[in-house]
UniProtKB/Swiss-Prot annotation:
Chief localisation class: nucleus
SUPFAM superfamilies: beta-beta-alpha zinc fingers
Species: Bos taurus (Bovine)
UniProt-recorded name of the protein: Fez family zinc finger protein 2
One Pfam match: zf-C2H2
Localization per record: Nucleus
Length: 458
């Protein structure tokens, strides 16, 4: 009691307010009643006081709604294009400009009550301060931004028909289920000239995508951007909007002289197909490299020759596949006869023999073949043309590899030798035929396939 009394004596008595009775005294700031009082609830989100942010639009004073839950996009500086003559205003400058502009900038909106967003009263294209009023209407204030999540910046393309093309935007998506109506999208955010007349109706089906009109605010024009960047967005747009963007892209490319890049097969950057025609047979190729690989068919050149058997090939890759024949590894075996092969493709061709399947039939004699290569070689026998001739004995052949094997008879090069009798052959086929006819009847003395291969390698 003494301590409390001393405290009261140290503090001067409170002065009575005007109009109050002298008996009523003011509660001390450090009184026990104030300290023990119940803590008040947290403060509500910021709401503008009536009259604090009023703008005279000519039709009476109307309040700007700063707490609208609408998503928005914050325009930044253009990326990778020519810098605009008039830079974007800072946040504080935009706010001050909105207060000074009043009704001239479309600040007057209707229906500030509740969570709805007022619609700009400006008719036609919004004026310079439209970006300001859009920010005010969409609730672009520090207290409203934490309610949404900021998505990675994306580049809006000049080819989609936007005057503010090439600008970098931050997409602010609110998790609230409240989205603007189609009237708001069509009447304010998409004025004439921003997109074509079909855009507002198409974009109404995708309420999360909003484009702020900052062309006049930044001083940007569509003719300043000559190189369009691809339209990027995390979410797939609805089909009507994609159709609208495609149409606008085609129109902008026509007007701006931007050449489209064709991604069709056989197409080039200028849209013209790449046709490389063979002058001999008229076959068409989509690349010059393929035409170069085709020409040895007519010239007969086989620069890639096997060092073991002397067989020539047009391509190095074919020679590499051929070299497997001379190795001992044959992992692919036939389940019916037990014959082993180096490649699985050769095994598949061999299985046709057991099945009796001969898909390649000669049109002249009706003979069938398991492989397409044998079918082509057989057709040359009906033509009677033997363009490959030996320079020593003038013997002619249908195929160039037959001439290559024939040349071994003149230089005594016979890489395939029989392990039983020691006879040499130019081709492995002739060696196998020799063993089958002469040595298979002997039985134990008949060499195996592995022995023949080892003889060739030695």
């Amino acid at each position: 009691m003494a301590s409390s009394a001393s405290l009261e004596t140290m503090v001067p008595p409170a002065c009575p307010r005007a109009g109050a009775s002298p008996a009523t005294s003011k509660t001390l700031a450090f009184s026990i009643e104030r300290i023990m009082a119940k803590t008040s609830e947290p403060r509500a989100p910021f709401e503008p006081r009536p009259g604090a942010l009023e703008a005279d639009s000519g039709q009476g004073k109307k309040l700007l709604n700063l707490c609208s839950p609408l998503p928005c996009m914050i325009p930044l500086q253009p990326l990778g294009y020519e810098m605009p003559s008039k830079t974007l205003l800072s946040y504080s400058e935009l706010w001050k400009s909105s207060l000074r502009a009043g009704g001239s900038g479309g600040g007057g909106g209707g229906g500030g009550g509740g969570g709805g967003a007022p619609v700009c009263g400006a008719s036609g294209l919004c004026k310079t301060n439209c970006g300001v009023c859009c920010k005010a209407e969409l609730g672009l204030v520090p207290s409203a931004l934490p309610a949404g999540r900021v998505i990675k910046p994306q580049v809006i393309n000049q080819a989609v028909g936007l005057p503010a093309s090439g600008s970098l935007y931050y997409f602010n998506y609110l998790d609230s289920a409240t989205y603007p109506s189609s009237e708001l999208l069509g009447g304010h955010l998409f004025p004439s000239g921003l997109l074509n007349t079909q855009a507002p109706a198409a974009l109404a089906a995708h309420p999360k995508l909003f484009l702020l009109e900052n062309a006049k605010l930044a001083g940007l024009t569509a003719d300043k951007f000559a190189h369009p960047a691809p339209y990027a967005h995390k979410e797939r747009l609805p089909a009507p909007l994609e159709q609208v963007l495609k149409e606008n892209s085609a129109l902008t490319a026509e007007r701006g002289g931007v050449k489209g890049h064709s991604k069709l097969p056989g197409g080039s950057a200028d849209g013209k197909p790449k046709n490389f025609t063979c002058e001999v047979c008229g076959k068409v190729f989509n690349a010059h490299y393929n035409l170069t690989r085709h020409m040895p068919v007519h010239t007969g050149a086989r620069p890639f020759v096997c060092k073991v058997c002397g067989k020539g090939f047009r391509q190095a890759s074919t020679l590499c596949r051929h070299k497997i024949i001379h190795t001992q590894e044959k992992p692919h075996k036939c389940n019916q006869c037990g014959k082993a092969f180096n490649r699985s493709s050769t095994l598949n061709t061999h299985i046709r023999i057991h099945a009796g399947y001969k898909p390649f039939v000669c049109e002249f004699c009706g003979k069938g073949f398991h492989q397409k290569g044998n079918y082509k070689n057989h057709k040359l026998t009906h033509s009677g043309e033997k363009q490959y001739k030996c320079t020593i004995c003038n013997k002619a052949f249908h195929q160039v590899y037959n001439l290559t094997f024939h040349m071994h008879t003149h230089n005594d090069k016979k890489p395939f030798t029989c392990a039983t009798c020691g006879k040499g052959f130019c081709r492995n086929f002739d060696l196998k035929k020799h063993v089958r006819k002469l040595h298979d009847s002997v039985g134990p003395a008949a060499p195996s396939t592995k022995d023949l291969t080892r003889t060739v390698q030695s």
